[in-house]
Amino acid sequence: MRKRAIALRFGSSQEAAEFLSLVSERMGDRVIVEQSGSSVKLVIPPSSDDARGDYAKLLSLIRQWRLSRQSPRGGVFKHSITLLLSAVKLRVGIPLSAVAELLQLKGFRAKLEEGFLETNADFESAVRAAEEFSEKYAETLDLEAAPLVRRLAAVLAAAYGRPVDEVVEALRGTGLVREGEDGKLVLAVNYADALKKASSLLGSA
């Protein structure tokens, strides 16, 4: 197979460098990279063991980057979950659907769809929301509580800038959370209703 090259131009030299860092992380020395300011050249050498496969992976990375970083059609970015997780500094593993919930509470549109976080929040805002949720979720791990209670408390604490224990007490006080037979805190209503009611109460407090 002959050498394949792709030339790209980014909005800034910093954005170009960030993209090359991603390419290096994902593809290593299977891609030869050159940067000149905001311009980038990517080369798949013909000596590659799987040049066609590497070229396809590179095109996929470029597509994911563009969907996530460029001005969106209809006001919605499509952030690749893979790209998002590679950029986030997580305290603990998190359910990504909770990040969508947090963005919604912050006033953004957000949903998970086929490997993408579709939202009108830009990439940096999505990364920040994931990190905020992860930090609060880590604090809930000491609670004697069911997983959904921890998730709910972390989402609300991150959305409204409240301590986790304060949020838990508010949930208990409103009857949305109760103590189960085994002593663990459990939801008294379904998760969606609890999130809606609690966000209304905490948002107006």
Q: Across the structure, where does each feature detected by a protein language model lie?
A:
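A short, conserved structural fragment
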Residues: 29-31, 107-111, 172-182
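Short amphipathic alpha-helical interface segments
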Residues: 101-108, 123-162
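Charge-rich, low-aromatic oligomerization/scaffolding segments with amphipathic character
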Residues: 49-67, 125-141, 195-205
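Short amphipathic alpha-helix segments
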Residues: 4-30, 93-101
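Short glycine-/aliphatic-rich beta-strand segments at the starts of folded cytosolic domains
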Residues: 1-13, 77-87
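N-terminal interaction modules that seed assembly of large macromolecular complexes
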Residues: 19-60
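Short amphipathic alpha-helical interaction segments
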Residues: 90-102, 157-174
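Accessory beta->alpha helical hairpin/"wing" motif in late/C-terminal subdomains of nucleic-acid enzymes
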Residues: 114-121, 180-199
